[in-house]
UniProtKB/Swiss-Prot annotation:
<comment type="subunit">
    <text>Interacts with SWI3 and SNF12. Component of the SWI/SNF global transcription activator complex. The 1.14 MDa SWI/SNF complex is composed of 11 different subunits: one copy each of SWI1, SNF2/SWI2, SNF5, SNF12/SWP73, ARP7/SWP61, ARP9/SWP59; two copies each of SWI3, SNF6, SNF11, SWP82; and three copies of TAF14/SWP29.</text>
</comment>
<dbReference type="GO" id="GO:0006357">
    <property type="term" value="P:regulation of transcription by RNA polymerase II"/>
</dbReference>
<comment type="function">
    <text>Involved in transcriptional activation. Component of the SWI/SNF complex, an ATP-dependent chromatin remodeling complex, which is required for the positive and negative regulation of gene expression of a large number of genes. It changes chromatin structure by altering DNA-histone contacts within a nucleosome, leading eventually to a change in nucleosome position, thus facilitating or repressing binding of gene-specific transcription factors.</text>
</comment>
<keyword id="KW-0010">Activator</keyword>
<protein>
    <recommendedName>
        <fullName>SWI/SNF global transcription activator complex subunit SWP82</fullName>
    </recommendedName>
</protein>
<dbReference type="GO" id="GO:0031490">
    <property type="term" value="F:chromatin DNA binding"/>
</dbReference>
<dbReference type="GO" id="GO:0016514">
    <property type="term" value="C:SWI/SNF complex"/>
</dbReference>
<dbReference type="GO" id="GO:0006338">
    <property type="term" value="P:chromatin remodeling"/>
</dbReference>
<keyword id="KW-0156">Chromatin regulator</keyword>
<comment type="similarity">
    <text>Belongs to the RSC7/SWP82 family. SWP82 subfamily.</text>
</comment>
<keyword id="KW-0805">Transcription regulation</keyword>
<keyword id="KW-0804">Transcription</keyword>
<dbReference type="GO" id="GO:0005829">
    <property type="term" value="C:cytosol"/>
</dbReference>
<keyword id="KW-0539">Nucleus</keyword>
<dbReference type="InterPro" id="IPR013933">
    <property type="entry name" value="CRC_Rsc7/Swp82"/>
</dbReference>
<dbReference type="GO" id="GO:0005634">
    <property type="term" value="C:nucleus"/>
</dbReference>
<dbReference type="Pfam" id="PF08624">
    <property type="entry name" value="CRC_subunit"/>
</dbReference>
Length: 623
């Protein structure tokens, strides 16, 4: 959604959608300035999150892989509403109803990205051509199969124009003048309900979605990318961020390699599983551990499973900032100035000393208290450490989490003694410099401040406000550091579950199709041949080892009963013949197992549907 000021600017310049009325209806053309403003907002949003893959969801010329899963919001009979232009909704969103009217009119300064129109036959309901909706979604002038699009979005009622309506749209510039025949169209409200922020100028996830409550339940973020970007916008991003150009070229090379049927997975350098996963220890180690544990002797043992460890000691990494010197608060208390801005303390100090009795000058408060270097001794916290119990050895331990935090505290910030005011020390606050004047950067969660503006603002703080400011900044430092650590540990967990599923550690989402269609077949096709001399029979024996998939292998499931309800595309959509005909609900991915080994082929105890890469070995003897 465009900001209020941006939306008002569009309207003030007279570039609101131009209205063309006639006997058949009215047409609302989207102004070009609105499209340019939309592109500017999207470009700004992408540049802000370009370094966060979980929000950008690359590649940019594809749809984001995290999208809103829509409910079944119409009935099975597809009953039409009172306007006879869309299906009646049996499920609504209270927040979404505040964003759009019953006739498709948007509220809250929102604008559609496509041209809309009305027909007198439909009582003023806003309509839109289906081809315009597809063009906005795909950001391309290429033609797409409308019938396939309708099948994918079967909750939208599609209508066709009459000959008179086609001429009206052609006359008013919605379609080319030489167009003939019928055109498919839908209501603008249906497009907003189905696609949400994707059809709104400057649309943001959740904010401009109809299903706002559902988006929050699905843990979507309002900062994540919404639109599939055009080639023009991607080139502008590459121009503004030259480092992004290299990533785009590498992605293009990967795509071209895939088109030549070359396996990118086999050439990829995947990570070893040993730093991530610790396998089950031997029986001797387990017995020794149990025996010593029974005697009360607790020895360290290898715990099978993930090796995700690493202590983060809060006291060592995040010290509470101190913006006061040793005597700052004592001086303010004696002057009764705890609620007076520190910029006036010098004046109050002069008055305090002038009112002091004779002979007391020796005990008067100093005018300027020198800056005290921060103590290297960490301040103790209630939670001195997290993630591990033993923190004594964590100080000397170089974990990946601690390495993630080091750049925040090393070589990025210099103390600015010019920020100290009457003994109050603000020298640790980050300031903008000539090196980063053109960038929006942060230091430990705090923005880089303008020196002159910051100095005037600091003079207005009172000692009580400084106490609160120290704790607020401390919370920002800790939260920023923990978020960085969470990113590292999230990657570790993803790698761990990749290993447990039989996937090469580090497999990318873009390689998933190749993994299923080519890599797994290559894994099954692997054989090993060894030749040994048998002294008893005085012959050479050739042993051929082949891989045979067990029921845990992807596409080799041996479960043949009812389908679980969660496999259907819609939650409320269940086939009517489930109870009557069991053959109608067999798994589509069922593969007949021709293995002669009954243990491998028919073991139901080990069956777990749709694991990715589990297999067993079969040995054949050839003399």
């Amino acid at each position: 959604m465009l900001g209020e000021d941006e939306g008002n600017t569009v309207l003030e310049k007279g570039n609101n959608p131009s209205v063309k009325q006639g006997e058949v209806g009215a047409v609302f053309i989207v102004p070009k300035i609105l499209i340019r403003e939309h592109e500017r907002v999207i470009l700004k949003q992408i540049l802000q999150i370009l370094d966060q893959d979980e929000l950008v969801q690359p590649p940019l010329d594809k749809f984001p892989y995290k999208k809103l899963e829509l409910p079944k919001y119409i009935d099975e009979l597809k009953t039409r509403d009172a306007t006879n232009t869309s299906y009646k909704m049996i499920q609504l969103d209270a927040y979404g109803e505040k964003k759009v009217g019953s006739n498709g009119e948007l509220f809250g300064g929102r604008h559609y990205l496509f041209n809309t129109f009305t027909f007198t036959a439909h009582m003023g309901v806003l309509l839109v051509l289906l081809q315009d909706v597809i063009k906005v979604l795909y950001q391309s002038n290429a033609t797409h199969d409308e019938d396939e699009f309708i099948v994918q979005h079967d909750q939208i009622l599609v209508m066709e124009t009459s000959e008179e309506q086609t001429k009206f749209l052609a006359k008013n510039g919605v379609i080319p003048e030489e167009s003939k025949g019928s055109f498919k169209y839908i209501t603008a409200r249906s497009a907003f309900v189905e696609f949400g922020a994707s059809v709104i100028a400057g649309g943001q996830r959740i904010v401009d979605d109809y299903w706002e409550s559902l988006a929050k339940k699905q843990n979507l973020s309002s900062h994540q990318r919404v639109f599939k970007l055009s080639t023009n916008l991607i080139s502008k991003i590459s121009l503004l961020r030259p480092s992004f150009q290299n990533n785009r070229i590498s992605n293009a090379n990967e795509i071209s390699a895939n088109t030549n049927n070359t396996c990118t997975i086999s050439t990829s350098k995947f990570e070893s599983q040993y730093p991530i996963v610790t396998e089950q220890p031997s029986a001797e180690i387990r017995e020794a551990y149990i025996e010593n544990f029974a005697k009360g002797e607790h020895i360290s043992a290898i715990v099978p499973g993930q090796s995700i460890s690493g202590t983060l000691e809060l006291s060592a990494q995040f010290r509470v900032p101190r913006y006061h010197s040793k005597n700052s608060f004592q001086q303010a208390l004696q002057m009764k100035a705890m609620d007076i801005p520190i910029g006036r303390h010098e004046e109050l100090l002069a008055q305090y000393e002038s009112q002091a009795p004779d002979g007391s000058a020796s005990i008067s408060l100093p005018n300027h208290i020198p800056s005290v270097n921060p103590s290297n001794k960490p301040i103790k916290r209630m939670l001195s450490s997290i993630l591990d119990i033993n923190v004594s050895s964590s100080k000397n331990k170089k974990s990946e989490e601690n390495e993630m935090i080091k750049p925040m505290n090393k070589g990025q910030h210099k103390n600015n003694t010019s920020l100290n005011i009457n003994g109050w020390k603000f020298e640790s606050l980050p300031l903008k410099s000539a090196e980063n004047s053109g960038k929006q950067q942060y230091y430990r969660g705090l923005p880089l401040y303008e020196k002159n503006t910051l100095l005037e603002r600091l003079k207005q703080l009172t000692p009580n406000e400084i106490k609160e400011l120290e704790h607020l900044h401390d919370a920002v430092f800790v939260n920023t550091g923990l978020q960085n650590v969470r990113k590292v540990r999230t990657k570790k967990w993803k790698k761990y579950w990749q290993y447990k599923a039989g996937i090469p550690i580090g497999l990318k989402r873009s390689q998933l199709d190749e993994f299923k269609n080519k890599y797994l077949k290559d894994v099954l096709a692997q054989t090993s041949v060894t030749t040994n001399f048998n002294e008893i029979t005085n012959t050479d024996e050739t042993i051929t080892t082949k891989r045979v998939p067990n029921p845990n292998f992807l596409g080799n499931c041996n479960i043949k009963d009812f389908k679980p309800p969660y496999i259907y595309s819609h939650v409320n959509k269940v086939p009517q013949n489930v109870a009557g005909d069991k053959t109608a609900v067999k798994l589509d991915t069922e593969v007949k197992n021709t293995n002669a080994n009954p243990v491998v082929a028919t073991d139901p105890v080990a069956a777990k549907p749709d694991n990715l890469a589990n297999f067993s070995n079969e040995v054949a003897m050839n003399n």
